[in-house]
């Protein structure tokens, strides 16, 4: 049985399998295909030719454009058909031909997307990725499995991120970057392989960071990249700075979970 709210607008040319749950004021355009284990919450709009499969949950007020594919079987050869998920939050814009694959048991079972993100044309988000809030992946940006993007990350067009990489909050990756190691918060990076070239000051200004906070961030950047010391050697000083500067605390979580080493 399909559970479709009476206020939903669904094209007669769309295919919605029995079991799908469609919320209030959802709009589904022609030639969309919605699988039986899909849940779509209020005011989300699917333009034409969108395919949503698997155990996929989509929040409110998202816009999903034509030829996007969400919740499809992942490309991990270990996958054996387990009921893994894609979970997407609210107010995301998922543009044409974006692909978002379901998770794997080995990776926790969920590919998770937060709120207020923009995925531009032909972006790919592989199994078990965890994308936070306010991120942008530009055209043809690709994330391998298990990648983590923290808040306000921008991935430039034609960039590729290696599996298990962590990209810290407020990072700006220039177009065409190949990223195989973790990128600390607030960094601008570009290249093949990506290298750091300063703090993302313009992005921080746009998001309301004050001068003392940006000064602290620049100081930590210099500790990491210009002191000649290892992360283990500078971490105590970063911890001390974080006691009085909340914006520095994100470094502590980043280094706690970083396993691939950082870009240099």
From Swiss-Prot:
Keywords: Acyltransferase, Cytoplasm, Lipid A biosynthesis, Lipid biosynthesis, Lipid metabolism, Repeat, Transferase. Its EC number is 2.3.1.129. It is found in: Cytoplasm. HAMAP family: LpxA. Belongs to the transferase hexapeptide repeat family. LpxA subfamily. Homotrimer. This is Acyl-[acyl-carrier-protein]--UDP-N-acetylglucosamine O-acyltransferase. It comes from Haemophilus ducreyi (strain 35000HP / ATCC 700724). The gene is lpxA.
């Amino acid at each position: 049985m399909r559970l479709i709210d009476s206020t939903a607008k669904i094209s007669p040319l769309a295919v919605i399998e029995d079991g799908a749950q469609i919320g209030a004021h959802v709009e589904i355009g022609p030639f969309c295909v919605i699988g039986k284990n899909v849940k779509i919450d209020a005011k989300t709009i699917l333009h034409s030719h969108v395919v949503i499969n698997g155990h996929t949950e989509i929040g409110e007020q998202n816009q999903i454009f034509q030829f996007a594919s969400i919740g499809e079987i992942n490309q991990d050869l270990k996958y054996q058909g387990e009921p893994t998920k894609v979970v997407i939050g609210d107010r995301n814009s998922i543009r044409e031909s974006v692909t978002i694959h379901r998770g794997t048991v080995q990776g926790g079972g969920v590919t998770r997307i937060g709120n207020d993100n923009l995925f531009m044309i032909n972006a790919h988000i592989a199994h078990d990725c965890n994308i936070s809030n306010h991120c942008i992946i530009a055209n043809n940006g690709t994330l391998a499995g298990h990648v983590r993007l923290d808040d306000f990350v921008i991935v430039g067009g034609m960039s590729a991120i290696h599996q298990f990489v962590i990209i810290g909050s407020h990072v700006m990756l220039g177009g065409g970057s190949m990223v195989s190691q973790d990128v600390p918060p607030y960094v601008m990076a570009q290249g093949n392989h990506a290298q750091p070239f300063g703090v993302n000051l313009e992005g921080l200004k746009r998001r309301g960071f004050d001068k003392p906070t940006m000064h602290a961030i620049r100081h930590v950047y210099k500790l990491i990249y210009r002191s000649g010391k290892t992360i283990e050697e500078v971490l105590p000083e970063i911890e001390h700075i974080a006691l009085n500067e909340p914006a520095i605390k994100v470094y502590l979580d980043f280094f706690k979970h970083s396993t691939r080493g950082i870009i240099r």
